[in-house]
């Protein structure tokens, strides 16, 4: 008989960043949010929409970004699969790094877990503390957050 870890199925607090810089950006984000909700994410808070220059090339179309705080009962890899599936469903094409895209869903934090799966997933998001397009909407819904790697409290 396999013994299951009880904490495995308990809800974890996760933060996701959703961005779009192609097509109807707001509609793309709303559709992504709807699909996330249908995939066992229980939204607790959603930031306002923030328009930001494309990074690292501000000549590319501007991004619209939001951050979501949610509860999720499964593991980080399951959440990553859901995010990638939604990006593809919305029409994201595999292109060069930082190319314009219809939908980009990033896991910013997964229950303060520190994880590195080579070329696949790093938690917390390795650049989250350096990017205003993440931090500004993040701080709208979470006034401070302890970064488990750099050991600093990030504040609005």
Give the positions of each predicted feature.
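Extreme N-terminal starter segment of soluble prokaryotic enzymes
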Residues: 11-15
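Active-site loop/short helix in cyclic nucleotide turnover domains
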Residues: 24
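A structural signal for short, well-ordered beta-strand segments
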Residues: 18, 46, 66-68, 105-109
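Short, surface-exposed acidic-centric catalytic microdomains
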Residues: 27-75
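Flexible, gly/pro- and Lys/Arg-enriched active-site loops
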Residues: 54-63, 72-81, 85-156
């Amino acid at each position: 008989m396999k013994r299951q870890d009880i904490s495995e199925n308990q809800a974890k607090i996760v933060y996701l960043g959703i961005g779009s810089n192609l097509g109807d950006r707001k509609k793309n984000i709303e559709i992504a949010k709807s699909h996330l909700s249908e995939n066992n994410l229980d939204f607790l808070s959603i930031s306002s929409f923030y328009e930001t220059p494309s990074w690292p090339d501000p000549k590319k179309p501007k991004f619209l970004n939001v951050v979501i705080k949610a509860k999720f009962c499964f593991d980080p890899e399951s959440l990553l699969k859901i995010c990638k599936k939604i990006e593809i469903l919305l029409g994201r094409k595999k292109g060069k790094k930082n190319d314009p895209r219809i939908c980009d869903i990033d896991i910013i934090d997964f229950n303060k877990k520190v994880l590195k799966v080579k070329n696949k997933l790093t938690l917390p998001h390795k650049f989250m503390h350096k990017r205003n397009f993440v931090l500004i909407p993040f701080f709208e819904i979470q006034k401070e957050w302890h970064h488990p790697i750099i050991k600093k409290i990030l504040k609005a």
